[in-house]
Each structure stands twice: as structure tokens, then as C-alpha cells.
Amino acid sequence: MTPRHSIAVTVQPSVEPVTLAELKGQCRVEHDADNALLVEWGKAARAMIEEATGRKLLTQTVRVQMADFPANGEPIRLPVWPVQAVTGVTYRRASDGAETALAGTQAWLDHDPPLLAPPVADGSWPFVDERYMNAVTITLVAGGTSAASVPSHAKQAILLAVGYWWGFRGDGRDPAEVQSIPGEAGLPAGCVRLLDLLTQKRYG
């Protein structure tokens, strides 16, 4: 069983699945005064959808941290997908707590879910220093390789979310309040089925 983990995106995607023009069309906005707001909301919607499904829509670097390796040499179930590459595994060595790179791991990236197996040399994970809450760090690159690879229902979910938030905007609200709308309103009910489609078929 894979230990509990934390996930952080350390390098964000360089492009977004939905363009500013598409966002403005969804919200029926013809002026440019709210361009920056709509772009930020598009990013927020993408991030919320990724968090809800575990599916990274576009190329990004992700850090996964755990307190320990799985017992008995079991593989680690990577919590995000699709995974393009595992670029590094480090751990706090049991003997002295020193951060140590682990070589020789086996990544089964086309598995559902993607798995990371221990070094083939002995088939076991090393012992870690239990004083550290995040003794194990896995760095990986995940996501689709281009905006064209993003499923249409993921793009539609982003548009639905931003359009929904736009309806909460109102007139004369404080800019700080407007910025906080995505976190307060969450994803609309119409996104639920679309998110289900994102998780029904992962590979192949």
C-alpha cells in the first residue's frame, strides 16, 4: 500500500488548454478590461479539475512527497497521470538523515495507475529516517504534451466553470473579492459528469 502523500506543482504549464478568446466567448465579454481576470480564472479552473481527477492536462513538473516507502517492496502508485517521466527519487537515509538519490527504480508509466517499482537489483526500498514527515520525494513530469492533446470535455469543463464564476461577479465588487470567487463558488454541478469522463479511461 502506498503511504499517504502530498502533491505540489513546481513548474506550471507554459500554455493553457483554453484560450482567452474562448473564455471571453463563454462569458460573452467583448471588452479587454477583464482579460487578466479571465486568464487567471482559466488557470484556476484547470488546476481545480486536475486536483479533482488526478489528471494533469498539460506538461508540468510535480513533486510527490511521502513519509516512507511502501512495505515489502510494493510499487508506489503515482497519484497523478498521465506521467511522461520520473526525473528523480530522493530519500532521507536512515543512518544519518542525509538526502540521498535513489537510482535504478522502474517506472511503469502506461499502467493504470502509473507505478514506480523499487530498484531491480534487490527488489526492495531503502530504509528512511523516520524523523522526517516527507522523507521520500519523487519528482516527475506529467500531463499532455500539447493543448491539442487535452480532451474536449476537459476544455468544456473549464469553460463551464469560468462562465459559472462570471455569473457571481456582479457589479462594483471589490477586486479582491472577485479574485476569490473560484475558491468560494467551487465547480458547478455541470462539471461533474465531465469530470467522470476524464477518469473513466486513463490509458489506451
Language-model-detected regions and their locations in the chain:
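Divalent metal-cofactor coordination and adjacent catalytic microenvironments
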Residues: M1-G204
